[in-house]
Amino acid sequence: MASASVAVEGGEDVTRTFLSFLNSFSSEDANADAGGEGAENPSGYRDYVEQLELMYERSGTTIYVNFQHLMEFDGVLAHEAVEANFYKYQPFLRRAAVEFVRQHKPAMVRWDGGKEKEFWVAFVNLPRVHRLRELKAENIGQLTSFSGTVTRTSEVRPELLLGAFRCAECDTLVPDVEQQCRYTTPAICLNAQCGNRMKWTLAQDGCKFVDWQRVRVQENASEVPAGSLPRSMEVILRHEAVEEARAGDKAIFTGSLLVVPEGAPSNMAGDRTELGGGGLQRFMFLRGGDL
């Protein structure tokens, strides 16, 4: 399917092009093009508009995107923005998802109490599924799939997604402070006359939380080289993905590989990581697709 390629340097371009994809992509149109029929979506079917109808019926808040669809729509967006820089552009993809819902189902955007909902984008059907031991530093921040066996799951906890902080010096409220997998306070007070950088109080009424679960995943037994011990990795599940995995399950996980400093203050309630190994870093896989 023809599409204007996105300039991957700009997040707004990613938002605009991804929104166009959600609004217009039709697998029936793509199949007609592949068959040489030349018909331009004669039925008017649009995959993600139809999916939104199901989300509305089920009160869902996650849009599942077939990566093959995105490649057909715009290869530059798929490979250079989403696949190569998923962690960087994820907020812009979610912004497009919110606008998509607002355009087609405005009643879904807010909870009954009037607070705005958070919407998520999850990708499935990537071209390659890695073995766990194939994940390296070069994969950090990319959209990647790997297969493994679940060995342990944690309880579900609330995670602080966007924090609102009140300055302890002048009482100024700083909203929507993005949390980077650890407890993150504002860099500086918004009050130009204050300059506070250190003293903050969390304003819970203005915060946004999401369900969070830690899952331990080990290499599949068939993939462990002879004479080697199986490797494992922590996977973070969020929102509708929590409680979907059980010990013993074999699954494909799609998301982004992150490096989290050991001993960094966590933004997961009740979660504490002891400093060890001289402050070494650990790999963590943030799930954003298949499960």
Regions inferred by a protein language model and the residue ranges of each:
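Charged, amphipathic alpha-helical linker segments immediately N-terminal to NTP-binding catalytic cores
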Residues: 290-291
